[in-house]
């Protein structure tokens, strides 16, 4: 192993069993858990995010859970800073950071760093007004004219990323794509603090059922269980807050946006259930796309009964624990 301290990434699609395996690992390895999930950062969003129970969190603490109010935003850059700080604290105690979750953009930000992008609150507010007045399709058309690479990457119905890409261009006169390419070239060889390489030897694990149909069944079952556990009431409580609205990143989380639309009268209960399940399946598909391109990832089958021993064998084989 290199002179860098070890870290473990436990990735995978939603409903694959990541948390269960992570907890088992903490029982046999000197690991501490860091959540890598863009929905779990929000307080009061427990059922729809499949947040581990209070009992589980008390017995097996996860960092970066319940660190933001739903009215606040939380970016990949903020995650990277928080995760690096948590990893350093864990390593200083002689423990191994075990990062678990399915927000692949966060993992990428941690590994590759993020270019500092220009921002301007007034420009962003104007773009938000344009989105409301003209629609997201018009914003996507504008982005395609000035930054076709970003437009091809960003879904036309993703207001947060559309607005951010246009904001960067309007503030700096440079596309987000060009900005990233230039800053990446400038940061080659820099350390993690400057946005370069991660100062850890990382073991990348991914867990998922080998049969995609099984994952789809799990997703449908879990969404139904969330509804039985009071997911609609959870979203109803969020809607009762005057500072929350459907355009916030928290409320756009998979499942939450569908229940919000149901409570707004835009969907029937059956439509909400169906669209929530479909949106979760689409999320899983995007996660698989990320993982297929992830370098040196070791796959585990969710359906196997010996994933703990398989994981320990793999970690021993690559000498990350020595």
UniProtKB/Swiss-Prot annotation:
Named cofactor requirement(s): Mg(2+)
Residues engaged in binding substrate: 14-19
Gene Ontology terms, MF aspect: ATP binding; tRNA dimethylallyltransferase activity
Keywords per UniProt: ATP-binding, Magnesium, Nucleotide-binding, Transferase, tRNA processing
Disulfide bond residue pairs: none
Region feature (Interaction with substrate tRNA): 37-40, 160-164
EC assignment: 2.5.1.75
UniProt-listed InterPro entries: Dimethylallyltransferase, IPT, P-loop_NTPase
A Pfam short name: IPPT
GO BP term, pick one: tRNA modification
Quaternary structure (record): Monomer.
Family statement drawn from the similarity comment of this UniProt entry: Belongs to the IPP transferase family.
General function of this protein: Catalyzes the transfer of a dimethylallyl group onto the adenine at position 37 in tRNAs that read codons beginning with uridine, leading to the formation of N6-(dimethylallyl)adenosine (i(6)A).
Name of this protein: tRNA dimethylallyltransferase
Organism: Pseudomonas putida (Arthrobacter siderocapsulatus)
Underlying gene: miaA
């Amino acid at each position: 192993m290199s002179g860098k301290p070890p870290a473990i990434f436990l990735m995978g699609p939603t409903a694959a069993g990541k948390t269960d395996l992570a907890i088992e690992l903490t029982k046999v390895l000197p690991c501490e858990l860091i959540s890598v999930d863009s929905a779990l950062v929000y307080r009061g969003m427990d059922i729809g995010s499949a947040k581990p129970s209070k009992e589980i969190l008390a017995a097996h603490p996860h960092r970066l859970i319940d660190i933001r109010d739903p009215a606040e935003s939380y970016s990949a850059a903020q995650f990277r800073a928080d995760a690096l700080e948590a990893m350093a604290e864990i390593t200083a105690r002689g423990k191994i950071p075990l990062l678990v979750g399915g927000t692949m953009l966060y993992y990428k930000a941690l590994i590759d760093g993020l270019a500092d992008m220009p921002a301007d609150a007034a420009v962003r507010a104007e773009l938000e007004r344009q989105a409301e007045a003209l629609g997201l399709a018009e914003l996507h058309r504008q982005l395609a004219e000035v930054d076709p690479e970003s437009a091809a990457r960003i879904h036309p119905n993703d207001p947060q990323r559309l607005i951010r890409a246009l904001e960067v261009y309007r503030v700096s006169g440079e596309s987000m794509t060009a900005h990233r390419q230039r800053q990446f070239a400038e940061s080659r060889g820099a350390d993690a603090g400057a946005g370069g390489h991660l100062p850890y030897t990382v073991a990348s694990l991914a867990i998922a059922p080998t049969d995609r149909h099984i994952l789809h069944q799990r997703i449908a079952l879990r969404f139904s269980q969330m509804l039985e556990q009071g997911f609609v009431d959870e979203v109803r409580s969020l809607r009762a807050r005057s500072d929350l609205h459907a355009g916030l990143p928290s409320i756009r989380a998979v499942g939450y946006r569908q229940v919000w639309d149901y409570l707004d009268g835009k969907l029937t209960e059956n439509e909400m259930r169906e669209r929530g399940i479909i949106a979760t399946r689409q999320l899983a598909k995007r996660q698989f796309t990320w993982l297929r391109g992830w370098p040196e990832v070791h796959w585990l089958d969710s359906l196997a009964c010996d994933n703990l021993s398989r994981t320990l064998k793999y970690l021993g084989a690559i000498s990350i624990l020595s």
